[in-house]
Curated annotation (Swiss-Prot):
Homohexamer. This is HPr kinase/phosphorylase. It comes from Streptococcus pyogenes serotype M1. Belongs to the HPrK/P family. GO terms for molecular function: ATP binding; magnesium ion binding; phosphorelay sensor kinase activity; protein serine/threonine kinase activity; protein serine/threonine/tyrosine kinase activity. InterPro entries: HPr(Ser)_kin/Pase (IPR003755), Hpr_kin/Pase_C (IPR011104), Hpr_kin/Pase_Hpr_N (IPR011126), P-loop_NTPase (IPR027417), Ser_kin/Pase_Hpr-like_N_sf (IPR028979). Mg(2+) binds at residues 160, 202.
Length: 310
């Protein structure tokens, strides 16, 4: 996904001190953010000009103690053509030398009212999500009791119909048919819809329906963390399925592993209710309540008791 300075301005609600349309369309290529330190003393070894440059109270205070000539020289050296933008936090008064250097080097100069640490967090959060490499997977992503559940299976098995039933039961649709997943970090997977398919569900025999129009804004969600994968497969006599819930199957997307549960589908089985139960059971396991372990402990106690009584 291409991220421009203008997108950052709109998302993080930055004020534009100086910029042109061309400068606002400049692409941001990394989510890393620099807070100049040694650079203000004139040391530019290992300086990364392709990053956003963020000036907070400490950087601003150091600049104000410099002479006008030195301040201009340092900022002129710091502002490179590769630099997408310079951001000043806390609504600090921007030195005229900074404005002059930004104009001469063609750098967008932005400001914000919020604190430096909060601003850095907001910008990093937006850039990490926007610049992350995306992988498209086939399935339906639902928010079930606040948990992101990716429903997959062979074509025609009823994924979208199950998603519709879950919406009717009060859960939220994130994406249908194509789910774009990406890793926010090494352990966190997120998913979102393709823009052209946002809020839409395709139901065989009915066609495409707009879930937001039919069921309201509470029935949809723009993105969700993906915490559990459900794989629907046709029930076959003799095929072994996990009946105790002690299987540890996982699937990997974008380098992140998440647990996967296989659910057999047959006529008369209410799949949506089963998926609800699977989501709640997974949440319970994360909280330390494992029904399978409880059963196994009871079984062990019963066997031990019977052996002693014999």
């Amino acid at each position: 996904m291409t991220v421009t300075v203008k997108m950052l301005v709109q998302k993080v609600k930055l004020d534009v001190v100086y910029a042109t349309d061309n400068l606002l369309s400049k692409e941001i290529t990394t989510s890393d953010i620099s807070r100049p330190g040694l650079e203000m003393t004139g040391y530019f070894d290992y300086y990364a000009p392709e990053r956003l440059q963020l000036f907070g109270m400490k950087e601003w205070s150091y600049l104000t103690q410099m002479t006008s000539h030195n301040r201009y020289s340092v900022l002129k050296e710091m502002f490179k053509k590769d630099t997408p933008a310079v951001v000043v936090s806390r609504n600090l008064a921007i030195p005229k030398e900074m404005v002059q250097a930004a104009k001469e080097e063609g750098i967008s100069l932005l400001s914000s009212r919020v604190s430096t640490s909060r601003l850095a967090g907001e910008m990093s959060y937006f850039l990490d999500a926007s610049l992350a490499e995306r992988t498209s997977v086939h399935g339906v992503l639902m928010d079930i009791y606040g948990m992101g559940v990716l429903i997959q299976g062979d074509s025609g098995i009823g994924k979208s119909e199950t998603g519709l039933e879950l919406v009717k039961r009060g859960h939220r649709l994130v994406a249908d048919d194509r789910v774009d997943v990406y890793a926010k970090d090494e352990e966190t997977l997120w998913g979102e819809p393709a823009e052209i398919l946002r809020h839409l569900l395709e139901i065989r025999g009915v066609g495409i329906i707009d879930v937001m129009s039919l069921y309201g804004a509470s029935a949809v969600k723009d993105s969700s963390q993906v915490q559990l994968a459900i794989y629907l497969e046709n029930f076959e006599a003799g095929k072994v399925f996990d009946r105790l819930g002690n299987g540890n199957e996982e699937i990997t997307f974008s380098g992140v592993r998440i647990p996967r549960i296989r659910i057999p589908v047959k006529t008369g089985r209410n799949v949506s209710v089963v998926i609800e139960a699977a989501a709640m059971n997974h949440r319970a396991k994360e909280m330390g309540f494992d029904a399978t372990k409880t059963f196994e402990d009871r079984l062990t106690q019963l066997i031990t008791k019977n052996e002693v009584s014999q």
